[in-house]
């Protein structure tokens, strides 16, 4: 779409905001159109989500719900992005690569579970970690060696970099990518629970990307100046549109689950956005719901191994609330509210620095 301006001699399609808008609606329409067809196909192929044997009783009725919906909304976002971005932008190409690679990892994991009808038959934890590290390196190393990405570490509400991580930045960035990817994966346990917080996180990071990529805005707001970063906003918009199309079918009661192909890709992409916008630490606030879910699992496993006692009735924490009697809809909406508030607070750091 950017290159249409060369043919028409109008600058309309050179604006990031215009192309982001087109990407959003293209992805939304694709997702809304393709998802019901995928649901029908998945039901015919019995490609449903295996339910964890110790899951709350209310989850037993979900055993026939199709999974791998992430493949559709990620594909929709990629197609929309490719139709709108500039192909000579290393940030945009790396971002798309991140989205695709982490989706493929999740897809392999999903297929293992679906084909064997066993929730433990996907990728082993060790293999999943290894593939995530490799995918992370493929996305990060070109940026590092091209000197396009600063290795300085920034903290929220402070305008100057804390210090330069130098070569250690690679290990730190891989940690951020993997942690974010798995955190969203852990959160995806209730209908729409991971979808809406992901939309909030993508929106917040998209704003940071746009401001840091604009030299005037970044200088005025004392944000890191990173030329070319704004192009990734188009991919953010496409993914938000695709997620909204997916949410139409994923809201309670869900007609389709995103599966690991969706959750791992979303988490990896959100982590990547935090890295290139220099918001690695602020990601703890931007993705607060994902952090909360992950910490609950760490506490549960650690407490059981050390003290042989459980902190929660079940982890991740959304299952704990199910066990104490909260209905699923109440948990979902309250977690959405927490995600919204945490992202608004993260946005406040733009001016308060």
UniProtKB/Swiss-Prot annotation:
The highest taxon in the source lineage is Bacteria
Listed under catalytic activity are: UDP-N-acetyl-alpha-D-muramoyl-L-alanyl-gamma-D-glutamyl-meso-2,6-diaminopimeloyl-D-alanyl-D-alanine + di-trans,octa-cis-undecaprenyl phosphate = di-trans,octa-cis-undecaprenyl diphospho-N-acetyl-alpha-D-muramoyl-L-alanyl-D-glutamyl-meso-2,6-diaminopimeloyl-D-alanyl-D-alanine + UMP
Subcellular location(s): the record lists: Cell inner membrane
UniProt main location, coarse: membrane
Identify one Pfam family in the record. Answer: Glycos_transf_4
Keyword Cell inner membrane in record: yes
Among the GO biological process terms of this entry, one is: peptidoglycan biosynthetic process
UniProt EC number: 2.7.8.13
> Into which EC class is this enzyme placed?
transferase
Ligase as a keyword? no
PROSITE patterns from the UniProt entry: MRAY_1, MRAY_2
GO annotations of cellular component type? plasma membrane
Could you tell me the keywords of this UniProt record?
Answer: Cell cycle, Cell division, Cell inner membrane, Cell membrane, Cell shape, Cell wall biogenesis/degradation, Magnesium, Membrane, Metal-binding, Peptidoglycan synthesis, Transferase, Transmembrane, Transmembrane helix
Q: Name any cofactors this protein relies on.
A: Mg(2+)
| UniProt xrefs under InterPro entries | Glycosyl_transferase_4 (IPR000715), PNAcMuramoyl-5peptid_Trfase (IPR003524), PNAcMuramoyl-5peptid_Trfase_CS (IPR018480)
| Topology class, membrane | Multi-pass membrane protein
- Which pathway does this chain act in? Cell wall biogenesis; peptidoglycan biosynthesis
Which GO terms label this protein's molecular function in UniProt?
metal ion binding; phospho-N-acetylmuramoyl-pentapeptide-transferase activity; UDP-N-acetylmuramoyl-L-alanyl-D-glutamyl-meso-2,6-diaminopimelyl-D-alanyl-D-alanine:undecaprenyl-phosphate transferase activity
- Looking at the UniProt entry, the stretches that span the membrane are 22-42, 65-85, 88-108, 129-149, 161-181, 192-212, 228-248, 256-276, 281-301, 330-350
Q: What does this protein do?
A: Catalyzes the initial step of the lipid cycle reactions in the biosynthesis of the cell wall peptidoglycan: transfers peptidoglycan precursor phospho-MurNAc-pentapeptide from UDP-MurNAc-pentapeptide onto the lipid carrier undecaprenyl phosphate, yielding undecaprenyl-pyrophosphoryl-MurNAc-pentapeptide, known as lipid I.
Family membership noted in the UniProt record: Belongs to the glycosyltransferase 4 family. MraY subfamily.
What PANTHER family does UniProt report for this protein, alphabetically?
PHOSPHO-N-ACETYLMURAMOYL-PENTAPEPTIDE-TRANSFERASE, PHOSPHO-N-ACETYLMURAMOYL-PENTAPEPTIDE-TRANSFERASE HOMOLOG
Q: Which NCBIfam families match?
A: mraY
| Protein name stated in the entry | Phospho-N-acetylmuramoyl-pentapeptide-transferase
Q: Which organism is it from?
A: Campylobacter jejuni subsp. jejuni serotype O:23/36 (strain 81-176)
Q: What is the lineage of its organism?
A: Bacteria, Pseudomonadati, Campylobacterota, Epsilonproteobacteria, Campylobacterales
């Amino acid at each position: 779409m950017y290159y249409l301006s060369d043919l028409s001699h109008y600058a309309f399609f050179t604006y990031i905001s215009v192309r982001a808008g087109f990407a959003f609606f293209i992805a939304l329409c694709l997702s809304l159109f393709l998802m019901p067809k995928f649901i029908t196909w998945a039901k015919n192929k019995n490609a449903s989500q295996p339910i964890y044997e110790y899951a709350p009783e209310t989850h037993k009725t979900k055993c026939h719900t199709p999974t791998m919906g992430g493949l559709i909304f990620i594909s929709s976002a990629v197609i929309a992005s490719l139709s709108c971005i500039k192909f000579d932008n290393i940030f945009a190409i790396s971002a798309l690569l991140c989205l695709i690679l982490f989706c493929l990892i999740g897809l392999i994991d999903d297929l293992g579970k679906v084909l064997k009808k066993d929730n433990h038959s996907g990728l082993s934890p060790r293999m999943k970690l290894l593939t995530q590290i490799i995918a992370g390196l493929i996305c990060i190393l070109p940026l590092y060696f091209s000197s396009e990405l600063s290795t300085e570490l920034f903290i929220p509400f402070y305008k100057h970099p804390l210090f330069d991580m130098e070569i250690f930045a690679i290990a730190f960035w891989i940690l951020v990518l993997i942690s974010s990817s798995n955190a969203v994966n852990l959160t995806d346990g209730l209908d729409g629970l991971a979808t809406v917080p992901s939309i909030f996180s993508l929106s917040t990071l998209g704003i940071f990307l746009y401001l840091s990529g604009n030299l005037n805005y970044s200088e005025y707001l004392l944000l890191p100046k990173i030329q070319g970063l704004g192009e990734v906003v188009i991919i953010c918009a496409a993914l938000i549109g695709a997620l909204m199309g997916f949410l139409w079918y994923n809201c309670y009661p869900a007609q389709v689950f995103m599966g690991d192909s969706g959750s791992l890709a979303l988490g990896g992409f959100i982590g990547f956005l935090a890295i290139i916008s220099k918001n690695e630490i602020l990601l703890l606030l931007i993705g607060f719901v994902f952090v909360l879910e992950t910490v609950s699992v760490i506490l549960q496993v650690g407490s059981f191994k050390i003290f042989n006692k459980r902190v929660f009735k079940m982890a991740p924490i959304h299952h704990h609330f199910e066990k104490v009697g909260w209905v699923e809809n109440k948990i979902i909406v309250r977690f959405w509210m927490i995600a919204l508030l945490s992202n608004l607070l993260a946005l406040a750091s733009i001016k308060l620095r």
